[in-house]
């Protein structure tokens, strides 16, 4: 129904990863303890990949904040309510399936500058700042991130192991991303009002205006502690489950 964040239903077999997969569209989420790959393509939207390694369960969401002109620090705004709702749906489903909030680790992606003409700042920047701030205030540690920039991204997440691989795409290669996200911004008022009404009822909003951001350094930053960077389609050498692979399309 339109007031709920729907579970992704596009199931397939992924020949590249040699396992069952799920493709997530905007405003969808999926959680599993199975040996699967969750795949999505992001423009200015963001995806949070959250895992409980002890329970062997994880999930992903894919969402965009409605562009109501509000700053990400305004917790009572409609867009912040919807963002909090999108995150809480994922977190609550993981808890229902046996995950423990105190063990959750997050990897966050997207927020690219692929949409123009928004009312305030670039919508990708707003989405990125929101997901960082939300997770910091929820005390869920971000162990890897690849946010902002000018590229769409293809993200593949293996919830059982926590492994993530990211491919940065040229916008012309994924022309449908911008069109799809423009359509999201033009959603009719009734559908948006229903989602926001559900968010107001079901989500307790964060309100701390100055919490410190828990974030890791970006992959391109030369620092010893950053996550290792590997190619999306690289050979199967062992990696730590906290690492994310990434590459840019030439």
UniProtKB/Swiss-Prot annotation:
Gene3D superfamilies, alphabetically? 3.30.1330.200
Does Hydrolase show up as a keyword for this record?
Answer: yes
Entry coiled-coil feature ranges: none
Transmembrane regions listed in the UniProt entry: none
* A Pfam family assignment: CheD
Key words of the record? Chemotaxis, Hydrolase
Taxonomy, superkingdom: Bacteria
Q: Which GO terms describe its molecular function?
A: protein-glutamine glutaminase activity
Uppermost EC category: hydrolase
This enzyme's EC code(s): 3.5.1.44
Does Protease count among this protein's keywords?
no
| Gene Ontology BP, a term | chemotaxis
Describe the reaction catalysed, as an equation.
L-glutaminyl-[protein] + H2O = L-glutamyl-[protein] + NH4(+)
Family that this chain belongs to? Belongs to the CheD family.
Q: What does this protein do?
A: Probably deamidates glutamine residues to glutamate on methyl-accepting chemotaxis receptors (MCPs), playing an important role in chemotaxis.
Annotated protein name in UniProt: Probable chemoreceptor glutamine deamidase CheD
Organism of derivation: Paraburkholderia xenovorans (strain LB400)
Q: List the taxonomic lineage.
A: Bacteria, Pseudomonadati, Pseudomonadota, Betaproteobacteria, Burkholderiales
